[in-house]
Swiss-Prot record:
<dbReference type="Pfam" id="PF22811">
    <property type="entry name" value="Zn_ribbon_NrdR"/>
</dbReference>
<dbReference type="GO" id="GO:0045892">
    <property type="term" value="P:negative regulation of DNA-templated transcription"/>
</dbReference>
<keyword id="KW-0067">ATP-binding</keyword>
<comment type="similarity">
    <text>Belongs to the NrdR family.</text>
</comment>
<dbReference type="InterPro" id="IPR005144">
    <property type="entry name" value="ATP-cone_dom"/>
</dbReference>
<feature type="zinc finger region">
    <location>
        <begin position="3"/>
        <end position="32"/>
    </location>
</feature>
<dbReference type="InterPro" id="IPR055173">
    <property type="entry name" value="NrdR-like_N"/>
</dbReference>
<keyword id="KW-0238">DNA-binding</keyword>
<keyword id="KW-0678">Repressor</keyword>
<feature type="domain" description="ATP-cone">
    <location>
        <begin position="47"/>
        <end position="137"/>
    </location>
</feature>
<dbReference type="Pfam" id="PF03477">
    <property type="entry name" value="ATP-cone"/>
</dbReference>
<dbReference type="InterPro" id="IPR003796">
    <property type="entry name" value="RNR_NrdR-like"/>
</dbReference>
<comment type="function">
    <text>Negatively regulates transcription of bacterial ribonucleotide reductase nrd genes and operons by binding to NrdR-boxes.</text>
</comment>
<keyword id="KW-0805">Transcription regulation</keyword>
<dbReference type="GO" id="GO:0003677">
    <property type="term" value="F:DNA binding"/>
</dbReference>
<keyword id="KW-0863">Zinc-finger</keyword>
<keyword id="KW-0547">Nucleotide-binding</keyword>
Length: 175
């Protein structure tokens, strides 16, 4: 690792710590004595997304997160839910062991998870992903969602009934 201050190629590691997705190392240059931090992360083999027009684009988790955040914007979702969905999708893609995946597979994976997470986010994403040309196509998706809904409320959805009518409250004893 070259020193960022004097560009000398040698440095010694003073401290190493595990961080979320790699190793953080504190280093000291053997020539100028300046200290700096480096991060080492595992970088999996390249994964490419094959677009509808057959272009190939390297998989970008940030682009996936951006689309998810746009669909989930201003929705009452638990903190970290969108990041977890993106992480789960990324892990599943890499676990497939393929070098290329079609963009339709990626889109379907997002749709599947958004449908479980939040109906409004699902419809928002579907309206862009499915490229609706008129309101009747959107209405059909919403009708299918309403008619096919098993539980009435998906995780992350707000109840229409006040909480005291939906579930009887119980008193808890203080410890």
């Amino acid at each position: 690792m070259n020193c960022p201050y004097c560009s000398h190629p040698d440095s010694k590691v003073i401290d190493s710590r595990d961080v979320d997705d790699g190793v953080r190392r504190r280093r000291e240059c053997v020539v100028c004595g300046q200290r700096f931090t480096t991060y080492e992360r595992f970088q999996p083999a390249g994964l490419f997304v094959v677009k509808k027009d057959q272009r190939r684009e390297e998989f970008n988790k940030e682009k996936l997160l951006s689309g998810l955040r746009r669909a989930c914007e201003k929705r009452p979702l638990p903190a970290g839910a969108v990041d977890k969905v993106a992480g789960d999708i990324e892990a599943e893609l890499y676990n497939m062991g393929k070098a290329e995946i079609p963009s339709t597979l990626l889109g379907d994976m997002v749709m599947e998870r958004l449908k479980m997470l939040d109906n409004i986010a699902y419809v928002r994403f579907a309206s862009v992903y499915r490229e609706f040309t008129d309101i009747t196509q959107l209405k059909k998706v919403v009708d299918n969602l309403v008619n096919g809904q098993d539980e009435g409320i998906y995780k992350g959805q707000l109840s229409l009934l006040p909480e005291d009518k939906a579930v009887p409250k119980t008193r808890y004893q203080r410890r």
